[in-house]
Every structure is written in structure tokens, then in C-alpha cells.
Amino acid sequence: MATMDLSSDLVEEILSRVPARSLVRLRSTCKQWEALIAEPRFVNKHLSHMRYREQQFTVFNNEHIVSPLFGSTTSYVGIDFNKPENCGVKLPFPIALSPAINISHCDGLLLYVTKSMLLVANPLLSQKRWIKCSEGFDHSMDAYGLGYLFNQSSGFYDYKVVRFRCGIKNSSRVEVYAFKSDSWKVVVDTNFGGFDGLPLSSVCLRGTPYWLGYNKSGNELMSIQSFDFSKERFEPLFLPPQSIGSRNLVKYISLGIFRGDQLSLLLECHETCKLHLWVMKKQHWSRLMTVDVPQDAIYGKYFSSFIERNGRLALLIKSRNISIYIGGENQEFKRFEYFTGLGPMLSDCCYIQSLLQIPGFSR
């Protein structure tokens, strides 16, 4: 049977909707595909599709599998709502030297904070790049964000890292690292008050990092802060009404990304023991869902949450093991258990696989 030649535009459109993991396997089968898949323009187009469709992972560091020989091993838990009973995916990604104290994510790139250095990695492409920390580095009190700004002259994104000091007794020193120049610089932002401790949660949306934490002012109120890399300054974001209060009113609260392009907030009230999911739409918070906390999950820790297209909420909860709860407003949560007997988790974040090359990476 004769084969049909497809136009290059149609081939590109088809490949841009293929999961990243499959494209990595396919790129060696055709030189033209390999060249296309490596193009920054195609990578950005593919990522824009995958933000809505790609399988999401929660990345966490397991303290029990840290060894002097192999360093720290990072594990991944995959979520597949179509087959939740088989959604546990454990993919080790060895990291040399000390274990990661904190992990954050931006478009398929992971930023690991260790006791002495920073590591940026794309596990799917087996790429990593170490970043030397500037003077005064303190992993116990420094918060980080990975993001980017669009470079008008080159037509590409310039990836950067922002770092700021937390703590009531510390000045809110802010520094920005540029991959392009491989250097840090101090940024002065007199309007940024800072957090009284490390942020409770952080995410990156369209290149802008966001953090949720308690204000340094001493009033025990929470706030959301974002960092604009183009203006090199922090910008506050107001919270939903139910989350404005002291530490005693909110039992749990966390930032998330809803369907790839909207900021979300999950909180549990102390009094009602109900979970409320809020989504930011056009600079206004809208409550999307309210559910009862699963009874056997009351004493666990929520790692991350996100919504699948049919309106189900997924909770990853850590107690003595990792459990996944899937449910909605009018349905009971179903529990799926994974990875029993794990040790303490040092850090975690949500992660989407991508074909994005680490800036400045060389083998």
C-alpha cells in the first residue's frame, strides 16, 4: 500500500500533540523529526499543548534513600486519572552530592536547592546544570523561584532564578541569577516586606514564580507574592476572603496551577474541616469546589493538588506512606496507596515533562 506524504506543517502539528516522553523515543527514528523536536519554537508550541494534556508528576525527595555513594535519589509519582489504580510511577533520578532541601519547577525544568549549590535539571532529557551560589548563601532561610522573561531582540525566553532571604530578623535581600551571563546580581525592592519564614508553597505560572507565606510584619497574616523578572520587583496578590486570617483559622493552604494557565489555591478550614479550591480568573478568585476532607486523611500532609477535566480533585497525602485520593463535590474520595515505608520527605513540587533544553547545557 502506498504511503501518503504529509506536509511539514501537518507533521509539526501532529507531533506537537504527542507526549514528551514519546517524542524523546521517536526523535532517533527520523533526522527531520529530530531537528524539529530540538527547535525552540517547536518546544514552546509543544509545551503550550502539554500544559493541558500531559501527565503531571509530584516530585519528592526521600530521605531514606540518601547514600554517600549515590547521593540523593528523587522519586516521581505519576497521576493518570483514566487508570488511577495504576497511576503510581516511580522514576529514580540520581543527584550527586547532598540531598535537595527544596525543589521547584518551571516548564519541565526542576530547580534543586542543596546545602552548597543549586542544580537545574530536565530529568526527561537527562540534562543538568550546577549553579554556584553567591556569597551569603543560606539554604535554611533562602527561598527560590525559577522563571523567565521574553527577550524581544532574540525572540526567545531568558531563564532566570530569583533568591530572597526570609525570617523576621533577616533583611529581605533579593538576588537574580541569569543563565545567559552565568552570574548573580543584587536587586533592590523597597516595597517587598518579606516572609517571616520560608514560604508555605510556591509555583511558577507562565514564567512568573509565586510564593505563599506569612508576612514578616508580625500580624500572622498570609500573602501571595510574585516576582516580575522584567521589572525585577515583587508584586503582591490578594487572597480569597476565607483565607485571610491568622494561622489558627487555616489548617492547610497551598498554591497550584489549574489546567495549565490559571493560579489555584487549596485551603482547609480548621472549624469546618472542608477543603475549598479557588481559581484565579481575570484577577479575581472564584471558588471552584468545596469537599469534605477524607476521614482517613485528616492527619496526613497534602503534598499537591490539581483538577482533571471531569472536575475531580486529586490529593497526594503523606503519613506513613504516599496515598492518592481522587474525588469530587458529589462523590466520595477513592484512595490509592503507593510507596509504603518511605522516610521523611524533604521537599516536593508538581512537574510536567517537557522537551525544554537547559540554557547553557553541554555534555
Swiss-Prot record:
Ranges occupied by Kelch repeats: 158-207, 209-254
Coiled coil residues, start to end: none
Presence of the UniProt keyword Glycoprotein in the record: no
Keyword match Repeat: yes
Keywords annotated in UniProt: Kelch repeat, Leucine-rich repeat, Repeat
Gene3D superfamilies on file: 1.20.1280.50
Every F-box domain range: 1-50
Annotated CDD domains: F-box_AtFBW1-like (cd22157)
PROSITE patterns linked to this entry: FBOX
Extent of the LRR repeats: 221-246
Alphabetized InterPro entries for the sequence: F-box-assoc_dom_typ1, F-box-assoc_interact_dom, F-box-like_dom_sf, F-box_dom, SCF_F-box_component
Domain of life: Eukaryota
Family matches, as PANTHER family: BNACNNG10540D PROTEIN, F-BOX PROTEIN CPR30-LIKE
Protein name: Putative F-box/LRR-repeat/kelch-repeat protein At1g11620
Organism: Arabidopsis thaliana
